A protein has these predicted regions:
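Flexible, non-catalytic peripheral segments of proteins
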Residues: 1-8
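Structured functional modules or segments
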Residues: 8-84
Length: 84
């Protein structure tokens, strides 16, 4: 059976999914599943047209899911991560 990488604490809670505000490439994923992130934390750095955009959570919480990896191409509205 595939071991879930989700923290059992947060497994049952439904979180907020953060979507890409614009299309581009995932330059860096700064956090791991289970990490605590605050509103000012750049969880993901998105690179679009040579500009880096920090994607921050709307509220503090724990990272439940990360939908992208470094180097991925994303379109506007694609899910990036989920926070609970």
């Amino acid at each position: 059976s595939k071991k879930s990488s989700v923290d059992p604490d947060i497994e049952d809670k439904s979180g907020t999914v953060i979507n890409a505000p614009l299309g581009g490439n995932i330059f860096k994923v700064e956090f791991n599943i289970g990490d605590t992130a605050n509103e000012e934390d750049a969880v993901i750095i998105l690179e679009a047209m040579k500009m880096e955009t920090a994607i921050k959570p709307p509220h503090a919480g724990k990272i439940k899911k990360i939908f992208v990896s470094q180097g991925d191409k994303v379109n506007p509205g694609d899910p990036l991560f989920e926070i609970v």
